[in-house]
Each structure stands twice: as structure tokens, then as C-alpha cells.
């Protein structure tokens, strides 16, 4: 959106992981990609001297006290978009004394996902006039797949049209054991059921592969789908595919939520494909979205293998209920969209670019 509004704008994107760097290199609207500097003066000074930004934008929870202070001293406005401050994080920031209070107060403006984040920012001493709730741009990030694209993806994964599939996305250590326990029970009732298992971090693929072997599951990986027909588990060992892979399933589970401290990963991607979504009890980072979706009957909490198996089974055997959830989920996603447009407009205004007609 921003590139369309201001084609002459130079956009430099910082990342913190190798996988993020690899993904960013494929974004045609980004002019340069670099690893975010360590948050101490020699490194931040060097980065700013090379880039010489007119505006710094950070998303979600990227609060770098040293960098924000340096930007403030150089009169470079810093904006927070998709701002999120959980209750646990707010307590930590308050315990840190003046460090994070001063950091938040040095932002030019904070654009928060929801009123919970707004309240936390106020508690940290940010002036109310410097805070605005604009929503979460993640609702705008996914482009809907056509039926033809979904069919091509299904064929790529060598799935039959009537094969039941459930997807466990963004899983963390300790969760795969629970998920596989539930899957083993589910296969008794649904012999053809396929689990697509997607660990959050690619460096854990070998660890999860070893677990699958130890538990004697027939499995294949996304990178070698030659034997998918006989597998009950497909291990997603590629980057950047999970969002679209949700389109293959009937039910989804979202990780980093079954084991303390958890926090939860995004519910938005599976909901955008109309899937009923399950999560564990530890969802502080996504609580606001989860509560709204819970109230609309779109997501469900489970705490152990038995509850996970029971809920997946109930949803699999009730296609009419899944269809009802799917229709409601699409309406829910549409109602939450619009934050990305607002953010692009804000950046354009801050840089004094004329807004296109």
C-alpha cells in the first residue's frame, strides 16, 4: 500500500532472524534489507549513519531503548504500529523503572492494536494524545486464494479431495508430544486423517523429525513429498507457507499456547481461511483477539491431549457446524480489516508526501 501511495519512497527493512531475512529478500516493495543492530550506541549509530532515515517505524513489541533514545536525540520521529503490550510485559516494563517509561514517551506516536495496549501505554506515562487505537494490520496481510490455487496446493501436498486434514501451526517444544498423542487417538476414529505439523522455528525440524521417528509415526516432510500417500503426518519444513497451508485443513491448532509461559501465536491466518481454531490456555499475547473470537464461537480452548482429540473429533464429524464457523469467521475478519490503509496514510502524512487521489 505504501509503495503504491509513494513510489519514490525508499524503504529499508530490518530483521532479527535468518528466516526473516530470507523472506524479506523476496519482497519486491522493499529497497534494502539488513539485520537489526544490537541495541548499544556504536551499532545503532553506525546503522543510522548509513541509512539516515527520515522516519522510523517499528511494529508489535519492538521496543529498543537505546535506538529509540538515539532517534529522539537526532529528531527522527519513531512510530509504533500494531502496538501490543501484554499485562505481563507491562508489569516488567514498570519494574524496570524509568528505562522503558522514558522509551515509550520518546515515541512520536503509538498506534495500538486494541484498548488493552492503550491502557498499558497510559500506565507507562505516555500522553493520551500520543496514543491511538487503529487495529491490527495482520487482518489485511493475507490475500485470499482462488479455488484453482487451493487445488494446486492440495495436489502439491498429494492430498485426496476427501482426505480429512488438521493443521498444528507454529508449535513450540513440548507441544508436539501433546499434539501427536491427540493425533494417535484421532486416527482410531478417523483412519485417513492427516496432520500437517508446522514447528514455529525451522531450526527445530530435526528435533521434531526425531520425535516422529521415536513415536513410530508414518510421516513425510514438505520438502520430500514423494511418500505422502502413506503418511499420517506431513512435517512442514519450509518457510513462508503456513498461511496458505491452512487452506488445506478442516481444523487448526495454533501453538505456543499449551506450555507455560506460552503467549500464543496469531489466530488470524487460520480464521481467514474459515477454519475453527483451537489453542491452549496460555494466550496472553493474543488474548484480546481470542476473547472476541471466543464470544463468536470461532475459537476453542483445550488444555491436554484428551481435550484436543475430543474437540478435533467433534469438529471433524460435524461439517455443518464447520461451515457455520467458516461463514462467521470470514465476516469477523472483514470487520477487523482496514488498519493497513490507516497506517500507510499516517506514514505518508508524516513524511509530507502528497496522498494520491
Give short role names for the model-derived ranges.
Residues 1-357:
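Nucleotide-activated sugar donor-binding and catalytic core shared by glycosyltransferases
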Amino acid at each position: 500500500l505504501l509503495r503504491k501511495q509513494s513510489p519514490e519512497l525508499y524503504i529499508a527493512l530490518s530483521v532479527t532472524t535468518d528466516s526473516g531475512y530470507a523472506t524479506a529478500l523476496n519482497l519486491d516493495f522493499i529497497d534494502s534489507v539488513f539485520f537489526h543492530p544490537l541495541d548499544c550506541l556504536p551499532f545503532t549509530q553506525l546503522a543510522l549513519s548509513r541509512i539516515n532515515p527520515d522516519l522510523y517505524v517499528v511494529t508489535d513489541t519492538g521496543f529498543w531503548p537505546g535506538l529509540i533514545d538515539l532517534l529522539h536525540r537526532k529528531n527522527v520521529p519513531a512510530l509504533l504500529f500494531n502496538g501490543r503490550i501484554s499485562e505481563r510485559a507491562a508489569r516488567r516494563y514498570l519494574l524496570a523503572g524509568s528505562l522503558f517509561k522514558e522509551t515509550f514517551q520518546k515515541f512520536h506516536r503509538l498506534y495500538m492494536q486494541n484498548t488493552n495496549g492503550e491502557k498499558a501505554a497510559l500506565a507507562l506515562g505516555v500522553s493520551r494524545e500520543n496514543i491511538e487505537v487503529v487495529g491490527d494490520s495482520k487482518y489485511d496481510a493475507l490475500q485470499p486464494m482462488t479455488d484453482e490455487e487451493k487445488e494446486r496446493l492440495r495436489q502439491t501436498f498429494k492430498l485426496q479431495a476427501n482426505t480429512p486434514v488438521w493443521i498444528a501451526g507454529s508449535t513450540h517444544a513440548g507441544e508436539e508430544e501433546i499434539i501427536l498423542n491427540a493425533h494417535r487417538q484421532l486416527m482410531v476414529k478417523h483412519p485417513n486423517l492427516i496432520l500437517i505439523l508446522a514447528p514455529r522455528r525451522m531450526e527445530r525440524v530435526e528435533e521434531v523429525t526425531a520425535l516422529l521417528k521415536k513415536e513410530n509415526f508414518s510421516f513425510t516432510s514438505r520438502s520430500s513429498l514423494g511418500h505422502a500417500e502413506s503418511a499420517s503426518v506431513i512435517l512442514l519444513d519450509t518457510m513462508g507457507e503456513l498461511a496458505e497451508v491452512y487452506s488445506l485443513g478442516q481444523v487448526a491448532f495454533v501453538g505456543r499456547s499449551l506450555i507455560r509461559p506460552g503467549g500464543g501465536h496469531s489466530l488470524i491466518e487460520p480464521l481467514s481461511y474459515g477454519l475453527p481454531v483451537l489453542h491452549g490456555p496460555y494466550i496472553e499475547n493474543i488474548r484480546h483477539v481470542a476473547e472476541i473470537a471466543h464470544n463468536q464461537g470461532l475459537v476453542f480452548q483445550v488444555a491436554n491431549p484428551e481435550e484436543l482429540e475430543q474437540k478435533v473429533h467433534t469438529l471433524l464429524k460435524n461439517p455443518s457446524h464447520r461451515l457455520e464457523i467458516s461463514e462467521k469467521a470470514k465476516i469477523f475478519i472483514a470487520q477487523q480489516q482496514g488498519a493497513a490503509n490507516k497506517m500507510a496514510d499516517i506514514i505518508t502524512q508524516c513524511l509530507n508526501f502528497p496522498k494520491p487521489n
